[in-house]
Amino acid sequence: MTQLNTPVARVSDPGHRPTPPPSVPRRRRPIRGTRRAFWLFVGPFFTGLLIFSIIALFWGFYLSFTRAVATISPTEFVWFDNYVSLLTDPSFLSSLLSFTVFAILVVPTTLLVSLVLAMLVANLPVARAFFRSVFFLPTAFSYVIASLIWKLGIFSGSPSSVANTVLSSVGLPPIDAWLTQSPYYWVVIVTVRLWLQVGFYMLLFIAGLQRIPDTLYEAAAIDGLSRGPRRFFAITWPQLRPTTAAVLLLLLVAAFQAFDEFYNLVRTIPSARPPLLYIYNLSFQQLDYGKGSAGAFVVTAVVVLVALLQSRFFGFGAADEAKKPRRGARKERAS
């Protein structure tokens, strides 16, 4: 008899499943037109940025070293004469003093009020989203509209205005010079700026409060540190240091950019003009574009200097640096 060489099928375990062969990942082909679509969306933005920001920045820097009166085409290269004339102009120095007073009044007030509101809203048992929306809503208002409301309705100087009605209700005489005399116009300017921007910085502090681990408060409660000022200064305030530094920097930059409320409320008072209003009058009323460009770069240099000093003394990322182990500690752990 002859044996047929037929393959014998292997009997496999019924519970065993054969392993499928490894699948080779397929390369995804790039979608056609992706690069073209990218430039179609981003191209107009970069074109506007190049024309209205970058080229304008370099052209303004060039104008600051030239004499350009009633024309943007320079007629004479004067080197640093515009800067010297600007820094020796009493009106410009008075505008820097106005900014200093405004910053001293509005920056700490906004910081304190926004921090207090953030802690109150963050600790509410209910309706947190509602109160966040209520306090944030004024940031959507225009500075021009808010200034007109303050000027025509709240601090108009008439006996029927809101401010004078409140003063009369508590037995105080009404004030007619809200918008013409110091320190009354500072009350008007600071309150309108406070109403417009405190909600935004409140949200920043709420975000900082939400980043604080609950374990820190639990450990403090175990150690006997109850709610109150001691726990705030021991735990909350150090953890909010990076957020506070960012808020301070944003407030200082916003104070330097103050223009709308001053222009609509006290533009006729020379002693209440901030640097931007002085540069506006210099460039668009006196038509001295060379000196106006020099003023813009002087203000920019002051903003950068103040920001560097603020970050140097208060510090960004101080909490992150504190969390990093020192080199000596690393060596001890390694040994």
PLM segments and residue spans:
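Cytosolic juxtamembrane amphipathic/interface segments immediately preceding
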Residues: 26-30, 34
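Low-complexity, intrinsically disordered short peptide segments enriched in small/polar/basic residues
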Residues: 5-8, 21, 28, 39, ...
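Short, intrinsically disordered terminal tails adjacent to the first/last structured region
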Residues: 1-25, 325-335
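A structural signal for multi-pass alpha-helical bundles of membrane permease subunits
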Residues: 34-327, 332-335
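Gly/Trp-centered helix-boundary motif
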Residues: 3, 29-30, 59
